[in-house]
């Protein structure tokens, strides 16, 4: 009997995961689970490079466009819901594919969410006050002192992530990293991790061209349609936050587009830093489809 296997296809933004994920899913006649924390939102299609209606017809997808912008959602909820969906899918398929670039969501399924302490209201209020009065840069500098390892990989432009890490440091006297690296949970399926990578110059060129394509497809109009919700964490996202600066009158449009490209490149580097720590990932160029399928066939028990 073939063991249940979860293929995890990961890689930085713009590397070429989408088309290859479709081809792998079609080869194994299975479904795709998205691990992109922004593709969850129905209003965010162009800026998240969400699967198109045609792609959704080719392969059944889960966790794409299922939330509204105002819905609260966490990696812990994602873990619970994906594990439930996987239990159902493995009754129909011996292989399921999970793909995306949201590092915490991938880890939530492969390793499980760590038992991070609940933050008390006093600590949260203290740090929110510091954020309001001192700004994000000062909090980032403090995080660098208290937890230099997490500082290297966290999105320093995301106040929610920075503040949460500091909350744990304040409350426990330990690093946030120490709670994130505990023993991983056992899963009732085999996990095979495929990483996609490209030469940096090649990847950066693809990212730049993809941003231009998003603008041609209507990213400005999409960002304008959600502008009223711009304070939500779900919109503290590359591609939207830069256009909000344009809509606020702070930047001109050409500058905003260049900042989207720059911030996308920075994000891709952070993704690779995170993924490269994982020795279970087998790395390929996206055009090595034949080699990837051969490796998967040989590895599925």
UniProtKB/Swiss-Prot annotation:
Gene3D superfamilies: 1.10.20.140, P-loop containing nucleotide triphosphate hydrolases. It catalyses: adenosine(37) in tRNA + dimethylallyl diphosphate = N(6)-dimethylallyladenosine(37) in tRNA + diphosphate. One of its GO terms (biological process) is tRNA modification. Keywords: ATP-binding, Magnesium, Nucleotide-binding, Transferase, tRNA processing. The record marks 102, 124 as: Interaction with substrate tRNA. Its EC number is 2.5.1.75. The keyword Transferase applies. GO terms for molecular function: ATP binding; tRNA dimethylallyltransferase activity. The keyword Magnesium applies. Residues 36-39 are annotated as: Interaction with substrate tRNA. ATP binds at residues 11-18. Its cofactor is Mg(2+). It is an enzyme of class 2 (transferase). Substrate binds at residues 13-18. Catalyzes the transfer of a dimethylallyl group onto the adenine at position 37 in tRNAs that read codons beginning with uridine, leading to the formation of N6-(dimethylallyl)adenosine (i(6)A). Belongs to the IPP transferase family. Monomer. This is tRNA dimethylallyltransferase 1. It comes from Bacteroides fragilis (strain YCH46).
């Amino acid at each position: 009997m073939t063991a249940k296997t979860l293929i995890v296809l990961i890689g930085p933004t713009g590397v070429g995961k989408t088309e290859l994920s479709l081809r792998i899913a079609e080869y194994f006649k299975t479904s795709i689970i998205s691990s992109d924390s922004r593709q969850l939102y129905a209003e965010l299609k162009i800026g998240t490079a969400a699967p198109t209606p045609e792609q959704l017809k080719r392969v059944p997808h889960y966790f794409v466009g299922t939330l509204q912008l105002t819905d609260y959602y966490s990696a812990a909820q994602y873990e619970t819901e994906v594990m439930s969906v996987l239990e159902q899918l493995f009754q129909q398929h011996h292989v399921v594919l999970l793909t995306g670039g949201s590092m915490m969501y991938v880890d939530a399924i492969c390793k499980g969410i760590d038992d991070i302490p609940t933050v008390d209201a006093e600590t949260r209020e203290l740090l929110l006050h510091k954020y309001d009065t001192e700004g994000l840069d000062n909090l980032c500098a403090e995080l660098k002192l208290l937890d230099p390892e997490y500082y290297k990989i966290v999105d320093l432009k995301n106040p929610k992530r920075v503040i949460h890490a500091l909350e744990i440091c304040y409350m426990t006297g330990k690093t946030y990293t120490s709670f994130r690296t505990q023993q991983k949970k056992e899963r009732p399926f085999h996990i095979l991790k495929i990483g996609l990578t490209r030469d940096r110059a090649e990847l950066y060129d693809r990212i730049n061209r993809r941003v231009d394509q998003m603008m041609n497809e209507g990213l400005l109009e999409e960002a304008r349609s959600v502008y009223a919700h711009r304070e939500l964490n779900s919109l503290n996202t590359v591609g939207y936050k830069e256009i909000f600066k344009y809509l606020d009158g702070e930047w001109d449009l050409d500058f905003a587009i260049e900042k989207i490209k720059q911030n996308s490149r920075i994000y891709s580097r952070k993704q690779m830093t995170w993924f490269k720590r994982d020795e279970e990932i087998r790395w390929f160029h996206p055009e090595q489809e034949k080699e990837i399928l051969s490796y998967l066939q040989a590895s599925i028990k």
